[in-house]
Amino acid sequence: MDRLGGISAIGGTPVVRLARLAGEGCAEVWVKMEAANPTGSYKDRMALAMIEAAEADGRLRPGQLVVEYTGGSTGSSLALVCAVKGYPLRIVSSDAFADEKIATMRAFGAEVELIPSPEGITPGLIPSMMRRAAEIAAQTGAFATDQFHNTDMVDGYRRLGEELLGQLPGPPPVSAFCSYVGTAGCFLGASRALAAALPQLHRVVVEPAESAVLSGGPPGTHHIEGGGIGHRPPQLHPADYDEVMAIPEARAFQTARQAARTEGIFSGPSTGANLAAAIDIARRLGPGHRVVTVQVDSGLKYLAGQLYS
């Protein structure tokens, strides 16, 4: 399939090794720089995969309305893809998420409906957004991408793992992969591609300590966008991972700031959580190993919030 416009630039992102954050006596830590995608987020991969798969099997008709619930980056990515392909897009989001993300969706032409949540990302917020998007689809006949239940989005991230295999052939081998999970699409797609070539890969899911449901804790309110949704992601099962790491919100924010100031990696809080987890794993493994994680998105999406204020 020929791809024109901005969607032709999705994927093929660079990978860099941390120079200072991990310290001495640790495994190498490598970061896939997904902010290099057109909207500054790895969600461009899943948005393109969901739309193109629906086009291919007829679920999405030319000019049909598309609807999605999103905290922002998926919405921005869908807005980009729909703009290039000529689909109107309606987004259900919330004021709990970064203003920059909402503005980006609208800049690409999406219609955005916001659900108020002054406390932040609460356990009930995502379910309420999901219900509203389902209502819109039922009322209008829109195609609902429904990211949490859409298996095509996992396929969109498989290429990320395949790219890593080509970029980091070793030695040393990639010993561990960690990723903050919302839909868990990036974790599932990338880890499956990596594990197919590296059967001993240690697979680590990352979540906020304030809503550590996968660790057996209660759902809670937090401010690390892109995950910690208050329940297990529908497509993520215990057999898919080897370990769960719960990163406190304050540490995720601190690590994101440190990465900007010491590594030149300018990102959001979810990347901070990824880096914190990767550093802990690297310290545990020691020299002779590689730990890989992902820069989720660009810090430009968070300049109006508390992260860099």
Please place each PLM-identified region on the residue numbering.
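PLP-dependent amino-acid enzyme catalytic core
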Residues: M1-S309
